[in-house]
Amino acid sequence: MKVFYDSDFKLDALKEKTIAVIGYGSQGRAQSLNMKDSGLNVVVGLRKNGASWENAKADGHNVMTIEEAAEKADIIHILIPDELQAEVYDAQIKPCLKEGKTLSFSHGFNIHYGFIVPPKGVNVVLVAPKSPGKMVRRTYEEGFGVPGLICIEIDATNNAFDIVSAMAKGIGLSRAGVIQTTFKEETETDLFGEQAVLCGGVTELIKAGFETLVEAGYAPEMAYFETCHELKLIVDLIYQKGFKNMWNDVSNTAEYGGLTRRSRIVTADSKAAMKEILKEIQDGRFTKEFVLEKQVNHAHLKAMRRIEGELQIEEVGAKLRKMCGLEKEE
């Protein structure tokens, strides 16, 4: 897999072009500001007088409605939540599309699963920072960047690579390194990582460890420190140095205990469950479930959020984070 760097990309394809960033959340703000500071012509499309309207104006952007931005722009970069994209696209973006324009995304969900079907003659590309928006902006301002992905679903103009690579350069991704992938690969691996490991698997492991210690009579504060708080130390070591050097940096006791006990926690059954989760992503079952959830106004999701917020680990964590100076009183 080839990695592209700053010297491989040029901004030329975007000169004299207008990029409309649709949405001004964490990624919308970071990507639009970075491209603007790279000398590209950026406008921001938002709901008229919505919460983000004044924020984008305060950041110096040319702000307009989504329809106005889509009409004006050559490249329309959609950065609103996945579950809202198709509805906004159909009502406010699709009528403004003309041959030669480019639709761009930072997640392939709606293109890969067919919720957005672009007309003929329109490029469809993806440029995705592999980092939260605040980090995308901060590292750019520091003169570096975060790694990213690019991919091309439809190359209607025969220069889609030049366009998406210029966007990656403008956002600052090629300063760190850019990998070319596909909409299918980006979408399915991203969803799997979120569900099985990063957001689903890790949080369930932390909760199970915390509850095991508390149920055995240990102080909740001690349980939190040992199963949640210190996780960042280990993740940072892995992030910076890899598994081998993480093991080198922890104590012999931790290394031996971890290596000899870990397979009893994440078992063959765990991996089988991961494979089933991946199948649900690949065959569209998860997507259908998520669409149905939206149709009932996220009732199940709201209930799960409420339950998570009432967990003992949340109450203990809030107190300890305040004690450690990590956040103000919640």
From Swiss-Prot:
It is an enzyme of class 1 (oxidoreductase). The keyword Calcium does not apply. The active site is at 107. Disulfide bonds: none annotated. Mg(2+) 2 binds at residues 190, 226, 230. It comes from the Archaea. Involved in the biosynthesis of branched-chain amino acids (BCAA). Catalyzes an alkyl-migration followed by a ketol-acid reduction of (S)-2-acetolactate (S2AL) to yield (R)-2,3-dihydroxy-isovalerate. In the isomerase reaction, S2AL is rearranged via a Mg-dependent methyl migration to produce 3-hydroxy-3-methyl-2-ketobutyrate (HMKB). In the reductase reaction, this 2-ketoacid undergoes a metal-dependent reduction by NADPH to yield (R)-2,3-dihydroxy-isovalerate. NADP(+) binds at residues 24-27, 47, 52, 82-85, 133. GO terms for molecular function: ketol-acid reductoisomerase activity; magnesium ion binding; NADP binding. Residues 182-327 form the KARI C-terminal knotted domain. The gene is ilvC. Binds 2 magnesium ions per subunit. Belongs to the ketol-acid reductoisomerase family. Pathway: Amino-acid biosynthesis; L-isoleucine biosynthesis; L-isoleucine from 2-oxobutanoate: step 2/4; Amino-acid biosynthesis; L-valine biosynthesis; L-valine from pyruvate: step 2/4. One of its GO terms (biological process) is L-valine biosynthetic process. This is Ketol-acid reductoisomerase (NADP(+)). Mg(2+) 1 binds at residues 190, 194. Residues 1-181 form the KARI N-terminal Rossmann domain. It catalyses: (2R)-2,3-dihydroxy-3-methylbutanoate + NADP(+) = (2S)-2-acetolactate + NADPH + H(+); (2R,3R)-2,3-dihydroxy-3-methylpentanoate + NADP(+) = (S)-2-ethyl-2-hydroxy-3-oxobutanoate + NADPH + H(+). It comes from Methanococcus maripaludis (strain C6 / ATCC BAA-1332). Its cofactor is Mg(2+). The keyword NADP applies.
